[in-house]
């Protein structure tokens, strides 16, 4: 709500001695909104400050899954590095999940263990961060081109055979003639 203070938005009605005694909460507040007055009304903040307050509110929560849309928008490089480190150490190994949509390639490399590319109604999974995704995608594209080249080569041979006219006694199956016409 625009009438809520930054503090109310981030920690709710938790007393200061409770949230301030939690090192994780203190680190999040210091990194993301340390320059924003704790008692400022959210409605008086700039768009970037509001985004950082919202991000702090999410990170303070104890979630098993986080879904973040462009989390690095309105963050400086130091804060982006902090966010990547925080997300990498947020959950114990093998627990927790992060779903992130971003154009920040460095951030993707830092926080992603796997990526999904969505295109033409298809979801292609890739292991690793952005750099690994690029390498794997190039290899998949190369393999797809090789398969298509072989298919086109076979099609050319079949069409050339049909153009010469199949001989009456040739044992070329009818299904191949039909397939070539399709």
Regions found by a protein language model. Name each.
Residues 14-20, 139-182:
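Flexible nucleotide-interacting loop at or near the entrance of a catalytic core
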Residues 1-148:
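ABC ATP-binding cassette signature C-motif
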């Amino acid at each position: 709500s625009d009438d809520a203070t930054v503090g109310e938005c981030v920690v709710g009605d938790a007393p200061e001695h409770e949230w301030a005694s939690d090192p994780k909460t203190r680190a999040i507040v210091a990194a993301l909104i340390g320059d924003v007055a704790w008692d400022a009304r959210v409605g008086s903040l700039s768009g970037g400050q509001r985004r950082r307050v919202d991000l702090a509110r999410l990170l303070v929560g104890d979630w098993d899954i986080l879904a973040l849309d462009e989390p690095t928008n309105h963050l400086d490089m130091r804060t982006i590095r902090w966010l990547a480190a925080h997300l990498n150490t947020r959950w114990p190994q093998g627990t927790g999940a992060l779903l992130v949509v971003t154009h920040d390639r460095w951030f993707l490399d830092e926080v992603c263990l796997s990526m999904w590319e969505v295109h033409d109604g298809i979801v292609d999974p890739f292991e690793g961060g952005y750099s690994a995704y690029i390498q794997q995608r190039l290899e998949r594209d190369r393999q797809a081109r090789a398969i298509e080249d072989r298919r086109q080569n076979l099609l050319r041979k079949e069409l050339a055979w049909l153009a010469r006219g199949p001989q009456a006694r040739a044992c070329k199956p009818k299904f191949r003639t039909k397939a070539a016409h399709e």
